C-alpha cells in the first residue's frame, strides 16, 4: 500500500513546478547575477531587464521570484503576467495581450506591474519594434523582463533600454546539489553512476535534469536509480557506447561500427540528431590519451568536427538518418587512410 501511495505521488506531482525556486536566493548556480537582482528588489526600483542564456538555468524562476519579493505573496499574481513569445510570434501579441495588461493601473498600491516575456527572441522584427514602442509608452507603470536564448536576436533599441544579464550554463556541482535535495525529499536512492548520467543528460539544464530524474523515479520506484535507468528513460546512448562506436570506425572497422549504429537506431530507438550530438560531444572532448592512442593529429580532429557539423545540418534539412550516419562513420574510417 505504501509503495502504491508513493507511486501515485510521483505520478501526480510535476517536480519542476514543485521544486521551482520562489525566492532569488534559491536560484542555483547564478550567484553574481542573483546578487545584482537582489539590489533591485531591496529598493523596489526595477529597470527593464533582459535575461539571456540557455534553457533551464533560472531565467524564468528569477523573473517570478522578483515579482514575488517586490509585490508579496498576496499581490504578485495580480501585478505580474507571463507570456511566451514562441506561441505567438507576430505583432498581435504586442497589440493585444501586452498592451491590455500594461495600460491598466497596478493593484494594491504596487509601484508598477511586471510583464515577463519568455523566448522574446522568437518575436519577429516588426513585433520587436512594436514592443519597443510599448515599453516606452508604459514605462511609468510597467516594467518588462524579457528572456531569450540569444541576445543577438533582440533588436538593439530594446537591448539599449534594458539591463542585460547573462545566465550561464549550470555547473555539474550545482545540478547535483539540487538533485540530491530532491532525492532526499522524495526518499529516492540514486547511485553515483545515476547522478553522473543525470548530469551528462542535462548538459547544464536544471529543468532537464529534474524531469529526467522524475521519469526514472516513475520506473524504478523500489530500487536505486542507476546509470542505465537514466539513459533508458531519456533515450540517450551510454557515452561509452558512443565512444566505442567512434573508436571502431576510426580504426577502420566500418562494418562493425555500422552494425552498432543500427542497434542504436533500431533497437535503442535513438534519433539520428541525438546520436550526432553525442558523437560531437565525444570528439570535441577527446582527452590526449585517446587522441594519441588513435594516432590522430589536431588537423584530424578539426576535419572530424567539420564533417559532424555537415551531417548535423543535413539531418535538420530532412536527409535520411541511416544514410547520413553511415556516411559519417565511413568518413571516420577513411580518415586514417588520408
Curated annotation (Swiss-Prot):
Q: Which SMART domains does the entry mention?
A: AAA (SM00382)
Q: Which positions carry the signal peptide feature in this UniProt record? A: none
| GO CC field | DNA replication factor C complex
**Keyword ATP-binding appears in the UniProt entry:** yes
Keyword vocabulary terms for this entry: ATP-binding, DNA replication, Nucleotide-binding
Residues holding ATP: 53-60
GO MF, one example: ATP hydrolysis activity
Sorted alphabetically, the Gene Ontology BP terms of this entry are:
DNA repair; DNA-templated DNA replication
Per the entry, what this protein does is: Part of the RFC clamp loader complex which loads the PCNA sliding clamp onto DNA.
* Known partners and oligomeric status: Heteromultimer composed of small subunits (RfcS) and large subunits (RfcL).
For this chain, the family text in UniProt reads:
Belongs to the activator 1 small subunits family. RfcS subfamily.
Please state what the protein is called: Replication factor C small subunit
Provide the species name.
Answer: Methanosarcina acetivorans (strain ATCC 35395 / DSM 2834 / JCM 12185 / C2A)
According to the entry, what is the taxonomic lineage of the organism? Answer: Archaea, Methanobacteriati, Methanobacteriota, Stenosarchaea group, Methanomicrobia
Amino acid at each position: 500500500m505504501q509503495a502504491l501511495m508513493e507511486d501515485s505521488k510521483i505520478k501526480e506531482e510535476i517536480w519542476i513546478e514543485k521544486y521551482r525556486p520562489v525566492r532569488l536566493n534559491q536560484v542555483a548556480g547564478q550567484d553574481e547575477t542573483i546578487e545584482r537582482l537582489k539590489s533591485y528588489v531591496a529598493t523596489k526600483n526595477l529597470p527593464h531587464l533582459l535575461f539571456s542564456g540557455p534553457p533551464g538555468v533560472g531565467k524564468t524562476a528569477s523573473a517570478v521570484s522578483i515579482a514575488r519579493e517586490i509585490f508579496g505573496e498576496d499581490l504578485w499574481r495580480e501585478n505580474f503576467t507571463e507570456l511566451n513569445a514562441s506561441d505567438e510570434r507576430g505583432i498581435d501579441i504586442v497589440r493585444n495581450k501586452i498592451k491590455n495588461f500594461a495600460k491598466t493601473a497596478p493593484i494594491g498600491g504596487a509601484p508598477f506591474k511586471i510583464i515577463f516575456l519568455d523566448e522574446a527572441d522568437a518575436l519577429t522584427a516588426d513585433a520587436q519594434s512594436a514592443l519597443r514602442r510599448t515599453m516606452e509608452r508604459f514605462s511609468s507603470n510597467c516594467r518588462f523582463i524579457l528572456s531569450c536564448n540569444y541576445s543577438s536576436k533582440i533588436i538593439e533599441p530594446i537591448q539599449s533600454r534594458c539591463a542585460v544579464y547573462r545566465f550561464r550554463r549550470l555547473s555539474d556541482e550545482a545540478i547535483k546539489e539540487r538533485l540530491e535535495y530532491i532525492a532526499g525529499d522524495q526518499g529516492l536512492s540514486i547511485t553515483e553512476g545515476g547522478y553522473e548520467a543525470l548530469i551528462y543528460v542535462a548538459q547544464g539544464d536544471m529543468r532537464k535534469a529534474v524531469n529526467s530524474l522524475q521519469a526514472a523515479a516513475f520506473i524504478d520506484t523500489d530500487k536505486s536509480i542507476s546509470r542505465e535507468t537514466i539513459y533508458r528513460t531519456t533515450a540517450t546512448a551510454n557515452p561509452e557506447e558512443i565512444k566505442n562506436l567512434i573508436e571502431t570506425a576510426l580504426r577502420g572497422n566500418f562494418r562493425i561500427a555500422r552494425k552498432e549504429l543500427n542497434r542504436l537506431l533500431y533497437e535503442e530507438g535513438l534519433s539520428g540528431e541525438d546520436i550526432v550530438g553525442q558523437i560531437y560531444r565525444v570528439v570535441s572532448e577527446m582527452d590526449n590519451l585517446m587522441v594519441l592512442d588513435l594516432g590522430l593529429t589536431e588537423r584530424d580532429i578539426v576535419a572530424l568536427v567539420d564533417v559532424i557539423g555537415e551531417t548535423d545540418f543535413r539531418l535538420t534539412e530532412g536527409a535520411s538518418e541511416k544514410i547520413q550516419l553511415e556516411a559519417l562513420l565511413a568518413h571516420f574510417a577513411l580518415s586514417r587512410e588520408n
